[in-house]
Every structure is written in structure tokens, then in C-alpha cells.
Amino acid sequence: IFIQVILPLRLEWEPFYYQEIELSESAGDASGLFPVTSTGSVTERDKEQVRVGDRVRVNFAGKEYVGVVSMADAGKQAEEMGIVDKVKPILGMAEGLEPVTKEEIELWRHIAEYYLCTVGEVYKAAYPAQKVEKEVVQARQEALKVEREEKNRTKIADKIKRLEERAEKKAELAAKARKSESRERYLAEKEMLEGEIGLLVRELTSMVGELCRTTGSVTGYGDSVTYHQDEEPIGGSIIETSEGTEKEISLSAAQEEAYSKIKEIFAKGKPALLHGVTGSGKTEIYLKLAQETLAMGKNVLYLVPEIALSRQLEDRISETFPELLVFHSGETMSRKREVATVLRHAGEPAEGKGYVVLGTRSAIFLPHKNLGLVIVDEEHDTSYKQDSPAPRYNGRETAIMMAKIFGANVILGSATPSLESLYNCSVGRYGLVTLNKRFYDAADSDIEIIDTIAERRKNGMIGNFSRKLIEHIGKCLGEHRQVLILRERRAYSPIVQCQECGEIPKCRCCNVSLSLHRRAEGSERLVCHYCGRVYEYTGKCHKCGGELKPLGSGTQKIEEEASKLFPNARIARLDSDTAQSRKYETDTIRKFSNGEIDILIGTRMVAKGFDFSGLSLVAVLQADSILGQEDYRADERGLQLLEQFRGRCGRRGEKGLFVIQTSQPEHPVYQSIDGKLDENGTMARFLGERKLFGYPPYSRVIGVVIKDYNQARVDLLSRDLGEYLRGALAVKVSLAPGVQNGPNVIGPYSPAIDKISNQNIRQIRVLLPKDRSLARNK
């Protein structure tokens, strides 16, 4: 029986294989090839035959892979191609691996066509662990990690016990001591021991919390984690549960109106874009739609751009729905496999039971069944886009593709919608619904733009803080309110420079300056933010021996300055350095939400869709670093970030204050912050600029990146490739601005950072008309 198989490789074709079948007597004298249907009932004749979606073990180029059967009746094709004698047999079925659904394969093909990659690359992204043996080994490694943590916990507990005994002994000696000097010495030693005990107790508490997070909901941990088709779904251990039944969701009049409009858009078979100002109650509308979908026995996929947002939403959603599945990269491999198993074994709509799956973009690749609703929250967020490796897909666009396959409804939501989504609304592809009022009828936050150049001239700056901002923060703290500060640069200082020769230390492997980082104990080091290499920092120039001076300020320095200005405030920092520990990130957000932190300083990760009830002041320091990026979307994304950040404050009926410190107070982006991002205002200007120069949404853009360790070779290759593309696409050279009637090729050119990890980088940008077919593009 000839079949075609999708392999997790970058192949433009799907290799042919054959399966040998022993026919039963009821098959008669049938001989030769006969096709295997992808649908239909199992008979005595074909019960051993593979079907579309089955996982099979095959040999390709001397290596064994697990592939997915994409065609099970390929005998005719193999004969036409004249390869019957060259086809290899399959090695067998991939035991313990569930079949792939036909909807999954269809989605993979759409993604491969749209994002110019192969189906095999999409399969590899959807199922990264391809071998049963590998999965079992990974589970065993996780089990060994748990065992090590258990041993460490036992050691620490024993040490605490010994220290407590020593502390008790010191207390007894102090009580018996006749001389005051001896008594004081014993008491001092007791305090030292108690301090050490306190540190160990905190460490032990942290370890226990991490252990519970890792293993608390996994049953049979360390056993084989592969699942057979006849297994019962194991949903209980990985479903977030809350006591009681589903809560009734009550909407305000404005929300009810928006909800009704969304239902009308769904009835027309279109995606809906919910453009609601921050704090307008978009989440309640999502949950109401989800509740209605679950009542029909269908599943809901709720996508968020970041893991941190997923964690904050878990409690909120589980309050409404007793059952919730969570899927993102922060979950263990075992938990992720269990989520997939639950969805595979989900009942039919008639059974009246559905699931809500909360996850990041990777949740799109789950084996969904009976999908009724897809929610894409913060649809503008760049985190939905995967840059590398292939498939370089956009989670928002892919979710819409998937919804079409399942016939599911789609709702996109944001306070700052993307230009592409607004454009799709203007041409009738999407339906637009707006929420202009905040849920608690709070007025929009006041905006104050502070000119840092003018402030410095009149001695109005203390470090990175203007005196005006210091006054606002002091007033806020005096009223027991919270402050959120955004600085879009981590580290202590972005660069250091020699005061004698002007040398700026750069990474040896990247064409980028090194950033100065300070550790908790006070030591300093230089770090490359692109390749991660770390260099010793001596404070002396390696060229002339002159003194190196830190220039600029990152979040570490801002935290240091804030601690000096407000010594009694509880201050924390949240950036990609501190958030390397998921526990620290979660704890920091929780503490700030609970009012245990007064001032939170961070990068753009603090500007996401968090809901902090006690926050009344948000400030952006050195805001100009957000703008001026090497991208035609720089102003759009800068405005979105600032609007999102502004929306963090004043969310509980109290008016907030948004402060921007900038050296360019007249910049159009700052003057456009008004909470009214729509197709008729600022976004209309952005769309006009895009149309003038032929950029999306009026065209499709393909970015071609060429990398090589040899600079001369990458220059030659990129130049030749650029000329080849111009010839292949029949590009007409024109110096006049405006939308060209045909394709256009820009470059090759060097990006701002043209060398990373010793690889020289060149780029080519290809602009294609939107009416050009995807197959022709590929």
C-alpha cells in the first residue's frame, strides 16, 4: 500500500513509502495495489492499513523519523512518477503517538503556503518531540530533577534543624552567663544563627513552591508519558478547577450593546474586532461569548501574547468557568501532552461539555476538536509573531485561518488595534465594534509631557527624574497609591565610553556596544544583549588605559536612583534579567497587584494588559528610545505601547496621571496620545503614509535575511540574490514614490546591527501586490 508521509524536515515534497498488508481470506484473490481510503469504516480487509493522520516510523537519508501520513492511496501517483521500484517500506507504526487530525494537516498546509515554508517545518513546530524514546527520556529527566530537588530540600531542612538546636543552646548559655559581655556574645551568636535560619527557610519555601508548581498536578510522574489510542482522557489532573458552578456574567449597557453587535458580525461569518479603551471591560465580553459557546458543547481557544498575562488571567477565568486548560511554554512537557490528550478525547457537541484553552500562540497547534470560538486578546501585540525558526507565522492571522477550517467564530480585541486589522474593517473583511467608555466610568488619565532638555537648563532634573515627576511620585506615595515606571532599556547603563580616547567597548562577536550590568553584591560586568557573551569589567579602557564612564541609564540605574529619592518606598524591578525566574516574575506581579510594592520599574513587559487597582501614576523615562526604530511600523508600535501603558492607571473609577519625559515634546506620536486610535484619526495618517510608499496593508512584504561568517561572501551573495529577484519578478525601476503596479525589491542593505554571533547580516525587502496569488509568491 503506497502512502505519502510528512517528515519534520525542510522538504518541498512529501516522500513515498509503502506498507505491506497480509490480506485475510475474505479478501479473495485480490492482488497488487489497492488504495487506502482516508475515511470510512474499518473492515477485515483494511483494519491494519494506515490512514491519513497516522504517525509512522520511516527511514530517510539514513536516519529514523516519525512522520505523518498525508496520503494513504498514493499508488497511482507512484506509478505515474515511475518510482514504484525505488520506494522504501515504512518501519512500522509509531507506538504510543496519537494520530494527527485532518484539520491539523489542513492548517499546516495553509501556514506553509502563506508563510513560504514547508509543511514539514510546520509539523516540526507543532510536534517538536518526534520520537517516543525522546519523550520518555525527557520525562525521566524531569523526574530526576524532582528527585534532586527533594534531596536538596531534605538537606536544607536538616540544616535548619541543626541550626535551631545550636540557637537554643546559645540562648541557654546566655541565660546562665554571669558576665554581661558573655551574655551579649551568646545573644549575638544566637541572632546570627536565627538570621541564617531565616534565609534557609525562605530558600526552602521557594523550593517547595517550585516543586508543587512542577509536579503538583501531574499523576504518575516519571512513568512512561506516551498515550495509546484506547486510553481514557486524563483531564482531571491538568484542568484548573474552582469551587462551585459557573458564575453568571453581568454586562453594563455599553457592553451589552457591543456584545449584540459582535453576535451580528458572527452571523455574517466575519471576524469581529473589539476596539475598547483600556479598562472598558473587554474581558467580560470575551467570557460571555465563551460561556455561550461552552453551552453548545464546543471548545474555546483564548490566546494571549505573553505567559505573564496567561497567569494573571487563570484565576479570573477559572472563577467564571470551573474547568480551564492552560497551555504555554512555561508548562512542563508532561502537562502540555496531557492538555493535548484531553482535547483529542473531547466529546462531541451533543454531549454538552466544552473546554476553555488559555494559551500563547503555540496553543494554535493543539489538536483542537469542536472548536467554536477563538479569542485573540491584545491582537496588536508583536509577541504573536514568530521570527525564527520557520514557520515565521503570526498567531493572529493563523488563528483566523484555523477558525475558518473549523467554522468557528473569531474575536480580536485591543485598546490599540493594529493598522492591518483597522484596514480590514474599513474594507469590510472584519466587523468593527467599539467601547469608548471605561467600565467604572472613570475619566481618561491626564497626560503631562515634560521636556527634559528645558528642565536640565533650569536645573530641574535629578538624575533621570525631573523635579515635577519627583513631586508627583511623592504625592502619590503620600496617598498610599502605586507608581509604575517604564524605561525601555535593561541593564545599568546601555554603553560605557573611555574619557580619554572615546573608545566604546563592543562585543567581539557582534557589531554592537556592550551594556554594563551590576550584580546584587555590587560586582560589575559587560554583557552583549544579542549573543549573551559576558566580559570582565575593570573600569579601564583596553586601548589606552583611560577611565571608562557609564553613559545612559537602564532599569537597574533607574531603580538605584528611585531608592535614593524615595528611601521608604517598597521598590521592585521587572525586566528580562529579573524575569528569568518565572517565580520572581509571577511573585512581583502578584505583590504589585496586592499593594505590597509601591514603585515598580520595568521594560515594556510591565505595559502589557495587567490590571492593577491601586495604580494612579505611570511614567515613561527617556521615551524617545521607544521611537525611531528601523521599521516602517515604528511610530505605530510606539504609539500602541504608550497608549497601553497609559491605560494601566486609573482603572477603578479614579483619575490617573500619565507622565512622559522626552527631549522631543512636539513629536507627532506624543501629540497623538488621546485614547482614540481609529481609522479616522491618527491611524488614518499612518495608513496614508503606508499607501504612499506601498507598504502593508496595501501590499505583502517578504523579508529576506542573508547571513554568512565571511563578509565578502555575504555581500556578493546578497547582491546576486537581489538582482535575481528583480529579474524573476520583472521589477520596473522607478524613483517616484507611491504604490507600484507590480512587485518591488528593496536592497540588499545592512541592518542597524549587521553582525551577530560572528555572522554578517544583509537584508532584502520584497513588496508584492496583495492580489498576487500565494502560490505564485512561493
What are these regions (language model features)?
Residues 1-411, 426-442, 728, 737, ...:
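Accessory, non-ATPase domains that flank or precede helicase/AAA+ motor cores in DNA-metabolism machines
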Residues 215, 562, 645-649, 721, ...:
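Hydrophobic, Leu/Ile/Phe/Ala-enriched alpha-helical segments that form helix-helix packing faces
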Residues 246-252, 256-259, 268-355, 359-715, ...:
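Inter-lobe coupling/hinge segments of SF2-like helicase ATPases
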